[in-house]
Structures are given as C-alpha cells and as structure tokens.
Design a protein with these regions (language model features):
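NTP/phosphate- and nucleic-acid-binding module
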Residues: 1-321
Length: 321
C-alpha cells in the first residue's frame, strides 16, 4: 500500500526507539518556533512504526507492506559524485509488518526476489551481498551492488554469482527461500564483511572478482527492534499482545540514475536501458530552411515506426544548437 510520510519528524519518536542520540551528526536537527525539537528524516523506521501502531491492532490485518517514495536528508561528511552521494536524495522505502519471525522472513525473501527482478528488468547485474546493519539495526541484511569502477564500495566476489538467473524461481515460499540460499552461499561481500583468509578459502583464484561497486538497494530484517521499545503491539491469535515483526527495504532512486549511467556508459555513448529510456528511437534529420527533403524522409520513418508501436521522437527543429 502506497503512502507519503513527511520529511520533518518529531524527535519524540526517535527518543522512544533510543536512536535520537545514537544516530550522530548525519541527522539534521532543528527546532520550531515553540522550541520543539524536530529533525529532517534521514530514514523512517520510527515514523512508520508510529503510523502503524496508531491504526493496526490485530493479527487479522497482517501481513502489511507499506511504502513511499520521498526525499531524505543526511548531513554527509563528504558529499561527492553528484547524485551518487549527496546530502538530499530521493528514495523508495518499504516496510513489512508480520505476526512472527517466520512470516517476517518470508516477507524478506519476497522483497529479496523483487529487488533482483527489478534490477534485472533494468538490465543491471545487481549482486546481493551480506551487509552490516549499521544504524538501522537487526541481524539480517543484504545490499544490492552493481559493479562500476567509479563505485565507492570495495567488492570481493565469486564470479559464479553471475550465473544464477532470478527468473528460474517462482514467487512462492519454498522457491524464494531456495533462491536466497543459492545467492548467499556464493561468496560476495563489500569491504565491511571482507576477510582475506575466507575469500581465498572459499573462492578459487580464477573465480575471484576484486573491483568497485555502487550500492543501489538495501534490505533489513530487524524483528522487534522498533516495535518493542515503541510499544507497537497487536493481538495474536490467542488474544495476547505481541510486538509486531518488521523489515525495511530501500532503493536509492536518485542514486540509481547515476549508477545506471556509470554502469552503461563507455567512451563513446551512454545507452539507457529500454524500461527507463525516454524514447526507443530519436530521429534527427539534417534540415535547413531551404531544404525540407531530409525532414520529409524523417517524417516518413517516424510514421512507419509509430505504426509498429515504437516510441519515437522526431526532432524537426531547423536551428543548430
């Protein structure tokens, strides 16, 4: 279910979770005219937990998946590379709510699969890697990294991970669990998890990939890390109160644009993947005020392509840039 959460959040819910002081200087803290402490949201776990606890009371309303696409702000110490790492950025955040850990990990697997399919559709080879949970917390996390020499993350991986086709799996629990196991049993980590001895032990020398990558997605399972301290409770099947189990799933939309450029660019041309390209074909005839023959040819090609339902743009401007 889509929603839209505000960018400005109350500090009170962050104090409830215990993260207000822990988050550090990346959080932009402000006060309103009454002196009330506010913040520009760097992430939304507290806010979505507050929304959920005010409206959902029973297991009968589960599972739930809520998401929004919204701006975030983090006071990055070294913003650089344009949209790749900036202080304000556009992001898709989704949050799952389940009755117990077993069902919650099924939701996690579904999002794991959905992310792989999404990046695959964008013609991107995104590698899911076991990741540190950082300030989000929890005990299960994967980041999705695409290889690019301009990336910030150091990547250590077994090249066999590229041989796994996400399309071979079905959108059902047993298949999704196998999918996550198949991907995660092959060595692939960033520098945060890298251990040289393990890399050499588990990956043959000829299969080792050591390069740079760009993180374009990150998913977390953190159980009741937020629901318990924030008293986000539901009635279970026996009528007892229990803390809801949660996960979060993010894709950096603005960063993804830059990442696609880095992954698809060569020294001669930048080629957008078809699902996000503005047009399939652009016709640029060499025209002038005194000669319309090329424009007429361009119009003929344009009409033929339109008949074939090809998304085409005809540039009929007769002025040089």
């Amino acid at each position: 279910q889509e929603m839209l959460m505000p960018t400005i959040q109350s500090s009170e819910i962050w104090k409830e979770s215990g993260r207000y002081e822990d988050y550090g200087e990346e959080m932009l803290r402000i006060k309103d005219r009454q002196g009330k402490e506010m913040l520009y949201g760097p992430t939304n776990e507290e806010l979505i937990t507050d929304v959920f606890r005010s409206s959902v009371k029973s297991y009968k309303s589960l599972p739930q998946l809520l998401y929004h696409i919204q701006w975030k702000f983090r006071d990055e110490i070294r913003p650089r590379f344009g949209v790749m790492r900036c202080k304000e950025f556009y992001m898709k955040d989704a949050y799952s709510f389940d009755l117990n850990d077993e069902e919650a990990k099924r939701s996690y697997n579904k999002m794991f699969y959905s992310y792989l399919k999404t990046f695959n559709r964008l013609d991107l080879k995104a590698i899911p890697m076991a990741a540190d949970t950082g300030p989000i917390g929890g005990d299960l996390s994967h980041e999705f990294v695409i290889l690019a020499e301009t990336g910030e993350s150091d990547v250590y991986a077994d090249k066999n991970i590229f041989e796994i086709d996400p399309n071979q799996y079905k959108f059902e629990d047993s298949s999704l669990q196998k999918m996550r196991e198949d991907f995660t049993k092959i060595y692939a980590v960033t520098d945060e998890k890298y251990v040289k001895e393990d890399f050499n032990r588990y990956v043959k020398k000829e299969n080792q990939i050591v390069t740079k990558g760009i993180e374009v997605g990150h998913i977390f399972y953190f159980s009741d890390k937020y629901s318990e301290p924030m008293n986000c409770l539901i009635d279970d099947k026996s009528g007892k109160k229990t803390s809801v189990k949660m996960g979060s799933y993010g894709i950096g939309v603005s960063r993804l644009v830059g990442a696609i450029i880095e992954a698809k660019y060569n020294n001669e041309v930048m080629k957008w993947p078809k699902p996000i390209s503005p047009f399939d074909v652009v016709i640029i005839p060499n025209i002038s005020k005194n000669n319309n023959k090329n424009l007429e040819k361009g119009e003929k090609i344009y009409k033929e392509l339109k008949k074939q339902n090809i998304d085409v743009l005809l540039d009929d401007v007769d002025e040089n840039m």
